[in-house]
Amino acid sequence: MSEEIVQRLLQVVQDLYAETASLTENDSELQLWYNRGYADGMVEAMQKLGYSAPLETAGVVVDRSLIAGHEFLPWGKAYRHGFEMGEKETGEVL
């Protein structure tokens, strides 16, 4: 069961990364920033819980520089909130 859940979560991460591939430093795209943060939070939770191997196999890598210096701007806040929720909810599922 857990392997199936991990694969589903991995697909969600990949879908969110594809959706947010063209992020710009623009507060008009707050939902995209939230979604990218959510995906990164999911990855963080999966790594902490010992699921690094499927992430590495899929080539999923969090770009930690993406938000650096923008934490207090509107898109940085949206990203951070998404990250926190993605990490929390993934932890609850796994």
Task: For the regions a language model picked out, list residue spans one by one.
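A ubiquitous short alpha-helical element
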Residues: M1-I5, D27-L30
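Charged, low-complexity interaction regions
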Residues: A21-Y34
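Acidic, low-complexity, intrinsically disordered interaction modules
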Residues: L32-I67
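Hydrophobic alpha-helical segments
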Residues: Y17, Y34-Y38, M42, Y79, ...
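Short amphipathic alpha-helical heptad-repeat segments
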Residues: S2-E19, N35-Y38
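N-terminal processing/targeting junctions
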Residues: L9, D15-A18, S22, K48-V61, ...
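Amphipathic alpha-helical binding modules
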Residues: G59-L94
